[in-house]
Amino acid sequence: TEEAMLDKVCSEFSKVIVVINANNPMELDWVDNYDSIGAVILAPGTGQTGMAALGEIINGSVNPSGKTVDTYVKDLTQTPYYNNIGAFAYNNVDDLKEAIAASDTAYEGTVSFVDYVEGIYVGYKYYETASDDGVINYEDVVKYPFGYGLSYTTFEQKMNDFSDNGDNVTFNVTVTNTGDVAG
């Protein structure tokens, strides 16, 4: 299993980089179970040449600059999706049941549906809103938030030319790379 592989690799090496090659967010709290995991690289949908660049990121010759485009949680069983999904049965579709039974020998007699209720509170929008509303403790639920990502360099930000005329607020931000590598 993947867990057995991680156990073996992390018991043999003190510096481990985990590469997640998956297009969908997943539960990632397990990362904290291994002291030797020093980095997690998200490499979804790499296409024809993406994996070739991965080695350059791992060896430090290319600075990773991507950010997460969704939220990665600690426990999927606590997500709205997990708790709203199910096989709910219709009880007013007798004609449909008969038609299905006549054409499908594997039919077991239930016409089910999914009660999808997240609405606008899907993905990172749910976690940000639920945290602001006091429904969840963000740090207890979210492992890697929307927009998370590290770099091999450091930056300094400075706000300049702040102006508030009552109707509009304007300002400029100067971002300076203060590290030794491009970012």
Task: For every predicted segment, state its role.
Residues 21, 26-182:
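Secreted, periplasmic, or luminal enzymes acting at the cell surface/secretory milieu
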Residues 1-35:
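Hydrophobic helix-and-loop "lid/oligomerization" segment in the mid-to-C-terminal part
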